[in-house]
Amino acid sequence: MRIHILGICGTFMGGLAMLARQLGHEVTGSDANVYPPMSTLLEKQGIELIQGYDASQLEPQPDLVIIGNAMTRGNPCVEAVLEKNIPYMSGPQWLHDFVLRDRWVLAVAGTHGKTTTAGMATWILEQCGYKPGFVIGGVPGNFEVSAHLGESDFFVIEADEYDCAFFDKRSKFVHYCPRTLILNNLEFDHADIFDDLKAIQKQFHHLVRIVPGQGRIIWPENDINLKQTMAMGCWSEQELVGEQGHWQAKKLTTDASEWEVLLDGEKVGEVKWSLVGEHNMHNGLMAIAAARHVGVAPADAANALGSFINARRRLELRGEANGVTVYDDFAHHPTAILATLAALRGKVGGTARIIAVLEPRSNTMKMGICKDDLAPSLGRADEVFLLQPAHIPWQVAEVAEACVQPAHWSGDVDTLADMVVKTAQPGDHILVMSNGGFGGIHQKLLDGLAKKAEAAQ
């Protein structure tokens, strides 16, 4: 079959393209911005990429067009597909029909930690000989790709609540039909497509509804929003994580780089890994519980996590200059900012200085939905620098004023980088947080710090 993918350079759609190639289909695709690393990955798989959406790319006519969720009516290719009656479907629908239908699906859903937890579950199964397939929203550190067909019945998927396509406004995850479901947490997010928390809970309950009776749902017992969702009705086995639940994690070190796994009060495993932070410990516990449902002993799962490498942009060390370390993180919601800063604080100790540099870039952030929670979430940083994005209906100066520590802002990335370099001293740790490229600020900081070191000699 010849498949053409509109919006191929996103992580999810690029992953589907790789799976389609592994299934033996001829695959082409287009995107408004064809750029590495995804373009390189796809071209290596023999997938032809086209820049832009000129309708001529649909000649000769493909057998099927997979339409990404960023595509809208008015797009020349979308209009041509509809006009010529070319068969089309959304990415999640294709995944269900061509990949997941006969598989044991382990899905990871929730507001935070999906990519990390899905990566952990995949690595546990891989290390324990299960050879799973996977589709993950970032490239897990232990693998070279974000999607793989696998060689067994088991398939791990990052289950996103975002919508499928302009013609299917349900959450992607309703197509995945999981047998093992991790619900990490639930908060209001994606304010561009959801009106309120109830609207998201409704979609999550659609997901809960399609887990089989002998399937299993693993969720944290202290999450009020999930508790309300589960109270709408659940027909599957449940395992709870947390103090009153079946599973607990007990820190053995302050930074959570070593921890015990407890099941029904008994120690069943111990994790020693390169990750830090209680949020990662929570993610790891979820992955261990999910792996047990498919047959992996918790002790084996815990051992496997010892060699787990996280996806890029998860408290990733980007470099060091003038004695200052620069980290990068994908955090783009107050809860994630709080967890990432807590993890870094645990890693570097209570007296080291942490400088937080934040770009409010997600749609929810830009709309100002969670702006009042930003200053408290930044509390563990010693100094804060904020970028003021253009064309948003609120001012980051409000957040700077609400911060208890010194806080500064600028509307220009270069100016902001200069301000950070000026204040940073040897021994400091800079944490850059954004779900985008942040104007290449990481390298600007490292270059600026190196120049500062030269000037001081």
Curated annotation (Swiss-Prot):
The keyword Nucleotide-binding applies. Pfam families: Mur_ligase (PF01225), Mur_ligase_C (PF02875), Mur_ligase_M (PF08245). It is found in: Secreted. GO terms for biological process: cell division; cell wall organization; peptidoglycan biosynthetic process; peptidoglycan turnover; regulation of cell shape. Optimum pH is 8.4. It is an enzyme of class 6 (ligase). Its EC number is 6.3.2.45. It catalyses: UDP-N-acetyl-alpha-D-muramate + L-alanyl-gamma-D-glutamyl-meso-2,6-diaminopimelate + ATP = UDP-N-acetyl-alpha-D-muramoyl-L-alanyl-gamma-D-glutamyl-meso-2,6-diaminopimelate + ADP + phosphate + H(+). SUPFAM superfamilies: MurCD N-terminal domain (SSF51984), MurD-like peptide ligases, catalytic domain (SSF53623), MurD-like peptide ligases, peptide-binding domain (SSF53244). ATP binds at G110, T111, H112, G113, K114, T115, T116. GO terms for molecular function: ATP binding; guanosine tetraphosphate binding; identical protein binding; UDP-N-acetylmuramate-L-alanyl-gamma-D-glutamyl-meso-2,6-diaminoheptanedioate ligase activity. InterPro entries: Mpl, Mur-like_cat_sf, Mur_ligase_C, Mur_ligase_C_dom_sf, Mur_ligase_cen, Mur_ligase_N, MurCDEF_pg_biosynth. Pathway: Cell wall biogenesis; peptidoglycan recycling. Its cofactor is Mg(2+). GO terms for cellular component: cytoplasm; extracellular region. Belongs to the MurCDEF family. Mpl subfamily. PANTHER family: UDP-N-ACETYLMURAMATE--L-ALANINE LIGASE-RELATED (PTHR43445), UDP-N-ACETYLMURAMATE--L-ALANYL-GAMMA-D-GLUTAMYL-MESO-2,6-DIAMINOHEPTANDIOATE LIGASE (PTHR43445:SF5). HAMAP family: Mpl. Reutilizes the intact tripeptide L-alanyl-gamma-D-glutamyl-meso-diaminopimelate by linking it to UDP-N-acetylmuramate. The enzyme can also use the tetrapeptide L-alanyl-gamma-D-glutamyl-meso-2,6-diaminoheptanedioyl-D-alanine or the pentapeptide L-alanyl-gamma-D-glutamyl-meso-2,6-diaminoheptandioyl-D-alanyl-D-alanine in vivo and in vitro. This is UDP-N-acetylmuramate--L-alanyl-gamma-D-glutamyl-meso-2,6-diaminoheptandioate ligase. The lineage of its organism: Bacteria, Pseudomonadati, Pseudomonadota, Gammaproteobacteria, Enterobacterales.
